[in-house]
Design a protein with these regions (language model features):
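Bacterial Sec-dependent N-terminal signal peptides
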Residues: 1-21
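Feature marking well-ordered beta-strand scaffolds used for ligand recognition
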Residues: 18-239
């Protein structure tokens, strides 16, 4: 666990000492409303590469905006997908991509859904192939372990739920995290079935999900960090 914390600190130090970024493009749609709570119009970013093009994803109170950023001299919005829930009540959206699909969630609104967008033919076309609340209505964050085709939905129906993406357009629930010491998973980073969970006021956990392939299985706890100086709210992490 100490090694994990050291790595995170070193990564933070590296990025803090990196060269300053240069602004090459700015986009702001003034027709979009800000959230009622914080007046934030935009709420998330993601990126992916497909068909030799680079794309940026921006979440807003209106939905999902996809930009082709391949040519820095000609950046443009190539796709927009309206959210199932839109407007001033939206504070958070989140995204991850896998196997030619973009997965989109929202953390607010009774009408919110999981959206799956076929992005395999961008920048020419896209298609929303799934837009439903049958699996879950809301999630604060999602993360996809692309090496194992598993989607982790944080603060959704439970503290965290895991879905198989063996069929990328039809996720199947394979785990509901059942740990009485964890009431909320705020964010997650997962690599090769090792899940690093940021559990808010419940601290930090590391689980092994390699044997989790059905709803009856539970992951193995590898490490737990619940008390440390200036702990605060364990919000998010990355490796």
């Amino acid at each position: 666990m100490k090694n994990i914390i050291t790595i995170l600190i070193l990564l933070f130090s590296f990025f803090c000492n990196s060269q300053e970024a240069n602004l090459i493009y700015n986009w702001n749609d003034t027709s979009l409303v800000g959230s009622w709570a914080y007046d934030n119009t935009y709420n998330e970013i993601w990126g992916f590469e497909i068909n030799n093009h680079e794309f940026a994803v921006i979440g807003s109170t209106a939905g999902t905006h996809i930009f082709d950023v391949s040519n820095v001299q000609n950046i443009y919005e190539t796709a927009f997908i309206a959210g199932a829930y839109t407007g001033g009540g939206v504070i958070h959206r989140d995204y991850h991509d896998f196997d030619g699909y973009l997965y989109a969630v929202c953390d607010e609104g009774s009408s919110s859904t999981l959206q799956i967008i076929d992005i395999s033919n961008l920048p020419y076309s896209f298609n929303v192939v799934y837009d439903d609340n049958a699996l879950f209505n809301k999630a604060h964050n999602i993360f996809i372990d692309t090496s194992t085709a598993k989607l982790y939905a944080c603060a959704s129906n439970n503290a965290m739920d895991v879905y198989s993406l063996a069929n990328p357009v039809l996720p199947v629930l394979i785990n509901e995290l059942n740990d009485p010491t964890i009431g909320h998973v705020h964010d997650a980073y997962v690599r090769n079935d090792t899940a690093y969970l940021n559990c808010g006021n419940d601290g930090f956990r590391v689980f092994d999900y390699s044997n989790v392939n059905s709803i009856s299985n539970q992951p193995n706890l590898l490490g737990s960090l619940t008390s440390y100086p200036d702990a605060g709210y364990n919000h998010s992490g990355w490796l």
